[in-house]
From Swiss-Prot:
Name recorded for this polypeptide: Inactive chitinase-like protein 2
Species annotation: Hevea brasiliensis (Para rubber tree)
A matching Pfam family: Glyco_hydro_19
Signal sequence bounds: 1-19
Family named by the database record: Belongs to the glycosyl hydrolase 19 family. Chitinase class I subfamily.
Disulfide bonds: C22-C37, C31-C43, C36-C80, C84-C88, C122-C184, C196-C204, C301-C333
GO molecular function: chitin binding
Length: 342
């Protein structure tokens, strides 16, 4: 069940900031409000930040895919909601697109996908709820709403496929099959390691451990995640296992955030990631298998057949079938070199 999901620093820093804000310098964090992340890890929407070397969101939140209000353009709820003048789906909906995550995954579908999560034998009984998931997802407007309807559904299937494996309580002969037992756990079973790798920007708090918690079993990178969510997770890592909305937010943050040199899981499943020649040489082709490589490639990929990889695929296929969408290609990572190793 343990997942090792470790995230790995534009121009001069604002005078009131002491640490980089985004990009690889900040653990892959994105700038708030769609601002550009410069090559040096700072946020703004000027040409110096959004031009050469820009790491992410390089239209600065003012490009052609956002909704338009009287003071500018972006694709956040503040711009695309009340008072929006045009293109109010923010570039993620429209004809064949998906604006409302609730229209992609309904409460009844959520319950059927995770039908045994509240079994008396599950340590996470009563913790994971549909309302918490939907509430958390609102902090990430592009999650599950990017592309056409099939792409949106496939992203949700992939997200729950990976997180269900991370939290599974299933076994081969389990009632309704092993892939109906996702979200049975909320904390890593082996909590002996502290998963502490201190740095000046993210010092480990005395007595705190950063083992796997929540749907994605977030490990190590509580500092980066907390910074992105506006929370002190270094001193309060248990929030990821005690606050159900924060738990889902942490998982979706990991899903949406590139981890240098890895792309984000979101960009892979929505077709926005294009492999480099180096990726192609390493066997990393677009598909669900690359997401497994992003999450736990160092332990599961490039080693031939692996039961853990098969388990991830099994959950994903079940959910795709429920949504009525195809699986895509390249589902495993058996012949992929892990990111960072080649």
């Amino acid at each position: 069940m343990k997942e090792i999901v470790r995230a790995l620093e534009g121009y001069g820093p604002p005078k009131d900031k002491a640490a980089e804000q985004c990009g690889w310098q900040a653990g892959g964090a994105l700038c708030p409000g769609g601002l550009c992340c410069s090559q040096y890890g700072w946020c703004a929407n000027t040409p110096e930040y959004c031009g050469s070397g820009c790491q992410s969101q390089c239209d600065g939140g003012v490009g052609g895919e956002g909704g338009c209000v009287d003071l500018g353009c972006a694709n956040t709820p503040e711009y695309c909601g009340s008072g929006c003048q045009s293109q109010c789906d923010g570039g993620v909906g429209g004809e064949g697109g998906c604006v409302d995550l609730g229209s992609i995954i309904s409460r009844s579908t959520f319950e059927e996908m995770l039908k045994h999560r509240n079994n008396a034998a599950c340590p996470a009984k009563g913790f994971y709820t549909y309302d918490a998931f939907i509430s958390a997802a609102k902090a990430f407007p592009a999650f599950g709403t990017t592309g056409d309807v099939d792409t949106c559904k496939r992203e949700i299937a992939a997200f729950f496929g990976q997180t269900s494996h991370a939290t599974t309580g299933g076994w081969p002969t389990a009632p309704d099959g092993p892939y109906a037992w996702g979200y049975c756990h909320k904390e890593e079973l082996n909590q002996a390691s502290s998963y502490c790798s201190p740095s000046p920007a993210y010092p480990c708090a005395p007595g705190k451990k950063y083992y796997g918690r929540g749907p994605i079993q977030l490990s190590w990178n509580y500092g980066q995640c907390g910074q992105a969510l506006g929370l002190d997770l270094l001193n309060n890592p248990d929030l990821v296992a005690t606050d159900r909305v924060i738990s889902f937010k942490a998982a979706i943050w990991f899903w949406m955030t590139p981890q240098f040199p890895k792309p984000s899981c979101h960009d892979v499943i929505t077709g926005q990631w294009s492999p480099t020649g180096h990726d192609i040489s390493a066997g990393r082709a677009p598909g669900y298998g690359v997401i497994t490589n992003i999450i736990n490639g160092g332990l599961e990929c490039g080693r031939g057949w692996d039961a853990r990889v098969e388990d991830r695929i099994g959950f994903y296929k079940r959910y795709c079938d429920m949504f009525g969408v195809g699986y895509g290609s390249n589902l495993d990572c058996y012949n992929q070199t892990p990111f960072g190793l080649g």
